[in-house]
Swiss-Prot record:
Listed Pfam families: Metallophos (PF00149)
Key words of the record: Centromere, Chromosome, Cytoplasm, Cytoskeleton, Hydrolase, Iron, Manganese, Meiosis, Metal-binding, Methylation, Nucleus, Phosphoprotein, Protein phosphatase, Ubl conjugation, Zinc
Residues reported in the UniProt entry to bind Mn(2+) 1: 57, 59, 85
Positions of modified residues (Phosphotyrosine): 307
Superkingdom, natural source: Eukaryota
Predominant location: cytoplasm
Protein name stated in the entry: Serine/threonine-protein phosphatase 2A catalytic subunit alpha isoform
Keyword Transport assigned: no
Assembly behavior: PP2A consists of a common heterodimeric core enzyme composed of PPP2CA, a 36 kDa catalytic subunit (subunit C), and PPP2R1A, a 65 kDa constant regulatory subunit (PR65 or subunit A), that associates with a variety of regulatory subunits. Proteins that associate with the core dimer include three families of regulatory subunits B (the R2/B/PR55/B55, R3/B''/PR72/PR130/PR59 and R5/B'/B56 families), the 48 kDa variable regulatory subunit, viral proteins, and cell signaling molecules. Interacts with the PP2A A subunit PPP2R1A. Interacts with the regulatory subunit PPP2R2A.
Xref: CDD domains: MPP_PP2A_PP4_PP6
Length: 309
C-alpha cells in the first residue's frame, strides 16, 4: 500500500482506538506486519534521546493509559518509553496494546516500546490476554499476531548513554551492555538465562544474587547495581515489573528506580501510578496519577490467578 495512504488509514485507526474501539482482525494483521518491519531494525539496547517520559506496567488498563497521556502529554508531542507489560490482568489488553503498537508504527522516532515478561505466549494464556482475544474476536488469530510481534520488541533501552531502562532487572550472565546487544531476542521469553533475567529479575535489600520467589529471574542487591552502573558508565537503572504504592520507588541508594504506571492495579490495589519525565539535561521529575473515572465496568466472570510480586 502507498505510504501516504497507509498513514492516513493509521491515523483513522488511532482515532478509533483512542475511543477504546478495537480494530478488525485484518487491520490488526497488517498493523503487526508493519510493526515487525520497524522493530526488526531496533537494537536489543535501543538508543533513545532525551527529553523522554518513561513509563512502567500498564496491564490492559486502557482508561488509565488515556489518563497517563493526559498527564504526560499526547503522543507524539511527548516522547515516550514504555518498559513492557501492556497486556493481561486489565479488561482492555486488546485496545491498549493495539494503540501502543499503532503509535509506534505512526511515530517510530517518538515512542519506544520494550518487552515485558507478560509479552509472551505462555504468560498471556494464563493471565487474560488470550481469553480476551477469544472473547473479542471469536478466535485466537489476533492473539497470535501480537504474540508473534512480541518476539521483535527490544529488550532494553539506553537514554543518552546514561539511563538504562528495562522491564525486570539485571542478570548474573550479563556484565556489559554489549552482552545484551549480542543476544538473539527473536524468540519466546525463555524459562532461564540472560534474556529471561532481564524481564523477570527484581532488586532486593540483600546483597549479591538471590533466588527469585517468582520462579524466574534473580534478585540482585545494591552491590550488583552499583557495579553494573559503574562498569557501563550509567547513572541509573530504570525498571518496572513491581507494584509500588506511590507509583515510583527508589532503591539501592538511587542506583535503581521502579516505575509502575497502572493505578489501582487490578482495579483493587489502591496504588497510585507514576511516570518519569527526563528533560533535555536528563533531570528527572515524577508525575503521579490516580485511576481515570470509569463508567460501568464490564463484568468479567473468570477470575485470573493472582500473583502480585
Amino acid at each position: 500500500m502507498d505510504e501516504k495512504l497507509f498513514t492516513k488509514e493509521l491515523d483513522q485507526w488511532i482515532e478509533q482506538l483512542n475511543e477504546c474501539k478495537q480494530l478488525s482482525e485484518s487491520q490488526v494483521k497488517s498493523l503487526c506486519e508493519k510493526a515487525k518491519e520497524i522493530l526488526t531494525k531496533e537494537s536489543n539496547v535501543q538508543e533513545v534521546r532525551c527529553p523522554v517520559t518513561v513509563c512502567g506496567d500498564v496491564h490492559g488498563q486502557f482508561h488509565d493509559l488515556m489518563e497517563l497521556f493526559r498527564i504526560g502529554g499526547k503522543s507524539p508531542d511527548t516522547n515516550y518509553l514504555f518498559m513492557g507489560d501492556y497486556v493481561d490482568r486489565g479488561y482492555y489488553s486488546v485496545e491498549t496494546v493495539t494503540l501502543l503498537v499503532a503509535l509506534k508504527v505512526r511515530y517510530r522516532e517518538r515512542i519506544t516500546i520494550l518487552r515485558g515478561n507478560h509479552e509472551s505466549r505462555q504468560i498471556t494464556q494464563v493471565y487474560g490476554f488470550y481469553d480476551e482475544c477469544l472473547r473479542k474476536y471469536g478466535n485466537a488469530n489476533v492473539w497470535k499476531y501480537f504474540t508473534d510481534l512480541f518476539d521483535y520488541l527490544p529488550l532494553t533501552a539506553l537514554v543518552d548513554g546514561q539511563i538504562f531502562c528495562l522491564h525486570g532487572g539485571l542478570s548474573p550472565s550479563i556484565d556489559t551492555l554489549d552482552h545484551i546487544r549480542a543476544l538473539d531476542r527473536l524468540q519466546e521469553v525463555p524459562h532461564e538465562g540472560p534474556m529471561c533475567d532481564l524481564l523477570w529479575s527484581d532488586p532486593d535489600d540483600r546483597g549479591g544474587w538471590g533466588i527469585s520467589p517468582r520462579g524466574a529471574g534473580y534478585t540482585f542487591g545494591q552491590d550488583i547495581s552499583e557495579t553494573f552502573n559503574h562498569a557501563n558508565g550509567l547513572t541509573l537503572v530504570s525498571r518496572a515489573h513491581q507494584l509500588v504504592m506511590e507509583g515510583y520507588n527508589w532503591c539501592h541508594d538511587r542506583n535503581v528506580v521502579t516505575i509502575f504506571s497502572a493505578p489501582n492495579y487490578c482495579y483493587r490495589c489502591g496504588n497510585q501510578a507514576a511516570i518519569m519525565e527526563l528533560d533535555d539535561t536528563l533531570k528527572y521529575s515524577f508525575l503521579q496519577f490516580d485511576p481515570a473515572p470509569r463508567r460501568g465496568e464490564p463484568h468479567v466472570t473468570r477470575r485470573t490467578p493472582d500473583y502480585f510480586l
